[in-house]
């Protein structure tokens, strides 16, 4: 091919084609007048189809489209064989917290949808753990309104964060199967299979998992109140799990069906060491305990969603749900308490706990549109019933050193509970001139809860538990909670803005009574009237930039455990007594969100502000006994609990588009109140002012064969308590890197290295550091690379630890947990895409 050569200049040869990367080669001027053979030139796919426009180059990390953040899956690289969980960890503002919950811009994702259809209802972990990354084209994050709000347009305040997965078109032509089997040292094993069939009008997914690597395929419906209930790593303890589930959806002309059923069984062994520093004005109170827990859980859930478009103006929605949980726990522990370096007590204990419970709920909603555009009427009915049964055996020996006495507890506790609740909502929307709408909403909720607790003490002579219950520790309790909600609002929608502004009036009433052998012991009645404005305002600066402000209030009743006036003496050093005098609480929240996307620089920014104030907040009053070192906790109502937070998420590409960045900043100030008292002194208000600041930054360099990331994070916590006049500071530093490299002969290597430094933790405010290194090597086989062999090494340096600090209004709690530790796995992953098969 003849070329017109610039005089005394190099020649830049570029070959491009729509949907492929551009080939570039610099040719020096010395080659002028000669023939050159460039050989075969390969162009690699690098296009993103947007409607009828193909944009060649790197897909933007995230794009803002009105109130939705759209993430392009192709802009993120994950190792071969990765699941959705590995992808969402890379999203700007996305993270998996210690409890395995998915957060986007600090908000918990309640549901994951696949092509707009619910996937295993309200269990996001089902998608995170079981859907392969390779099937996902886009991820859309947004706050979705409730079923009632979507049909009527009325704002009922029941939004939930949603992550909607867009499936690649070529994955909707048949069956897809992802089978994985793995074995490793220390007896580790993993077996999983996900079978999918996605079509435009139907979806079918069957999931099965079996492993002993802490990798539950579904969420556990109930984590018992063990030491593990907190913000800790998923890898805490040793967990064997097995699960099976099916998700089915289908759309007919007038009917939409969403359904799923899932079973999960777990066997968890967990050890922890905990130190508690109580906030007292005079004495220094420290307790230290070690515990060993063995827990087994069996969870069964079934959900369905049926939407029937009866005619062009009438719509019916029906949602039933059934949940069943059975669990047993075995616990043993040792505890010591000190006051000003003096040993006050020591306790050894062992407990057996078995329980079962079920919940059945129904939701029926009917919506009717009238001839005048915008006028509609809706009726929504919710009903639920529940039953629980628990049997506990507690044995402990506590020695008190000051008076040289010993207390032995050997008892059996039978807990039985049941209840029902219903809610009726009536909504009417009337159109007004100039595109305004007047909204009326009335809601009535009624809830009845019954709880029976009977305690039986051990008789040494009989060598059995006595037949008569302990009247001082036993009772029956009933609570009745009712609330009326009156809402009137005006809404409008314009080209640049829309708003919904109104007012809520919500009287709440809580009646409770405690009795034994049909003899009433306590009877209380509390009435509260709450008033709150409501606001939902959205302003669109452009298609890619918008501002939203939301303000609303919501009431909540105290739990039965907080209300029931009976002492739980399971642990004589930590006694808990319910308070039937509690009032319902009322929470006011204000949220401000700003989203913007710069098309030219492919930069996405999300800013959010959040303020919350709780009236009649349920908090704790802790009474400390300086003789025994024991604590008695009782819930009380208290005002002044509030928090405010702000977050910034920013991502995009540099001018050199091989480089990209992600940053997430978070700041929160929280004011927590409670009461502390020593012996029988007057209770003193204990306030904790807590500041949290976090900064996370990541830079990534990417070529066709290599992706290299450097990341860092700083987490700062500062707490001040007025009773102890004490300030605590902790710093958590993370510095790490990720490598993904495509080697010759089809090999792929990926590795991540993270250095952790934690300072200010523990009784002596010491620091801890550790280095975590994980690595994997994989190779694909067969003609279409359907078979993947993978060698994966976890915690190569054996330095993984788990430590958690929890700060309340009355104490600081530091805990260390056992972890899975170092091990390796060999996986075989078979991926079949049976195109066109039915």
Label every PLM stretch briefly.
Residues 437-545, 724:
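Signature of Gram-negative outer-membrane beta-barrel scaffolds
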Residues 9, 18-36, 44-52, 58-332, ...:
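Membrane-proximal, glycine/serine-rich, low-complexity loop/turn segments characteristic
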Residues 2-10:
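Short Pro-Gly-centered beta-turn/loop motif in secreted/extracellular proteins
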Residues 67, 214-230, 271-288, 335-348, ...:
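Surface-exposed loop/turn segments flanking beta-strands in extracellular/periplasmic regions
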């Amino acid at each position: 091919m003849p070329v017109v050569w610039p005089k005394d200049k190099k020649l830049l040869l570029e070959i491009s084609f729509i949907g492929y990367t551009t080939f570039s080669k610099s040719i020096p001027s010395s080659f002028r007048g000669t023939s050159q053979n460039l050989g075969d030139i390969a162009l690699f796919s690098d296009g993103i189809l947007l409607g009828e426009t193909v944009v060649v180059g790197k897909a933007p990390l995230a794009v803002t489209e009105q109130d939705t953040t759209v993430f392009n899956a192709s802009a993120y690289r994950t190792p071969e064989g990765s699941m959705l969980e590995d992808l969402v960890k890379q999203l700007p503002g996305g993270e998996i917290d210690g409890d395995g919950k998915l957060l986007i811009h600090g908000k918990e994702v309640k549901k994951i949808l696949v092509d707009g259809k619910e996937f295993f209802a309200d269990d996001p972990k089902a998608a995170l753990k079981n859907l392969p990354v390779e099937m996902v084209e886009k991820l859309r994050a947004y706050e979705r309104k409730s079923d009632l709000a979507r049909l009527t347009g009325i704002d009922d305040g029941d939004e939930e964060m949603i992550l909607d997965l867009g499936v690649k078109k070529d994955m909707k032509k048949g069956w897809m199967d992802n089978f994985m089997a793995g074995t490793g040292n220390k007896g580790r094993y993993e077996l999983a299979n996900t079978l999918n069939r996605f079509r435009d009008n139907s979806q079918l997914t069957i999931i099965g998992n079996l492993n002993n690597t802490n990798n539950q395929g579904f969420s556990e419906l109930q984590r018992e109140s063990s030491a593990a209930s907190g913000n800790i790593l998923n890898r805490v303890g040793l967990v064997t799990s097995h699960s099976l589930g099916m998700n089915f959806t289908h759309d007919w002309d007038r009917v939409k069906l969403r359904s799923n059923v899932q079973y999960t069984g777990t066997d968890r062994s967990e050890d922890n060491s905990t130190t508690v520093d109580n906030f007292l004005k005079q004495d220094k109170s420290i307790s230290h305990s070690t515990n060993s827990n063995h827990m087994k859980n069996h969870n069964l859930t079934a959900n369905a969603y049926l939407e029937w478009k009866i005619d062009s103006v009438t719509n019916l929605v029906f949602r039933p749900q059934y949940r069943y949980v059975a669990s047993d726990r075995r616990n043993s522990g040792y505890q010591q308490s000190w006051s000003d370096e003096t040993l006050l007590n020591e306790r050894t204990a062992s407990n057996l706990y078995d329980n079962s419970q079920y919940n059945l709920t129904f939701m029926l909603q009917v919506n009717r549109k009238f001839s005048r555009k915008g006028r509609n009427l809706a009726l929504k009915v919710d009903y639920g019933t529940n039953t629980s049964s628990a049997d506990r055996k507690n044995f402990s020996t506590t020695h008190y050193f000051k008076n040289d006495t010993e207390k032995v507890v050997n008892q059996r506790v039978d807990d039985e509970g049941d209840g029902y609740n219903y809610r009726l909502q009536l909504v009417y929307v009337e159109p007004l001139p100039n595109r305004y709408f007047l909204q009326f909403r009335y809601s009535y909720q009624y809830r009845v809860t019954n709880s029976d607790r009977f305690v039986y003490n051990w008789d040494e002579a009989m060598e059995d538990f006595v037949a008569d219950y302990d009247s001082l520790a036993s009772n029956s309790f009933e609570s009745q909670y009712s609330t009326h909600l009156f809402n009137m609002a005006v809404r409008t929608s314009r080209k640049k803005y829309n708003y919904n502004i109104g007012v809520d009036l919500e009287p709440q009433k809580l009646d409770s009574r405690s009795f034994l052998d049909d003899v009433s012991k306590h009877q209380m009645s509390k009435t509260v009237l709450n008033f709150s404005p409501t606001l939902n305002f959205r302003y669109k600066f452009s298609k890619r930039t918008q501002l939203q402000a939301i303000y609303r209030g919501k009431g909540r009743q105290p739990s039965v455990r907080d209300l029931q006036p009976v002492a739980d003496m399971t642990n004589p050093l930590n006694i808990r007594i319910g308070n039937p005098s509690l009032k319902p609480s009322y929470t006011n929240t204000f949220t401000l969100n700003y989203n913007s996307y710069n098309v030219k620089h492919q930069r996405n920014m999300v800013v959010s502000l959040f303020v919350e104030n709780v009236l009649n907040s349920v908090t704790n009053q802790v009474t400390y006994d300086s003789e025994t070192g024991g604590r008695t906790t009782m819930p009380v109502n208290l005002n002044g609990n509030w928090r405010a937070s702000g977050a910034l998420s920013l991502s995009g590409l540099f001018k050199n588009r091989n480089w990209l960045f992600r940053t997430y900043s978070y700041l929160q100030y929280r004011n927590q109140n409670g009461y502390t008292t020593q012996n029988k002194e007057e209770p003193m208000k204990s306030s904790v002012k807590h500041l949290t600041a976090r900064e996370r930054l990541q830079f990534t360099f990417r070529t066709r064969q290599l992706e290299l990331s450097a990341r860092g994070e700083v987490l700062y916590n500062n707490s001040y308590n007025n009773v102890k006049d004490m300030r605590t500071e902790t710093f958590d530093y993370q510095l790490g890197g990720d490598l993904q490299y495509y080697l010759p002969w089809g090999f792929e290597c990926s590795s991540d290295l993270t250095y952790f430094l934690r300072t200010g933790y523990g009784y002596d405010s010491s620091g801890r550091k550790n280095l975590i290194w994980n690595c994997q090597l994989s190779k694909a086989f067969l003609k279409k690379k359907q078979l993947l062999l993978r060698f994966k090494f976890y915690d190569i340096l054996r330095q993984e630890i788990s430590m958690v600090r929890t700060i309340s209004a009355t104490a600081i709690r530091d805990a260390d947990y056992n972890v899975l530790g170092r091990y390796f796995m060999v996986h075989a992953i078979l991926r079949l895409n049976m195109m066109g098969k039915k």
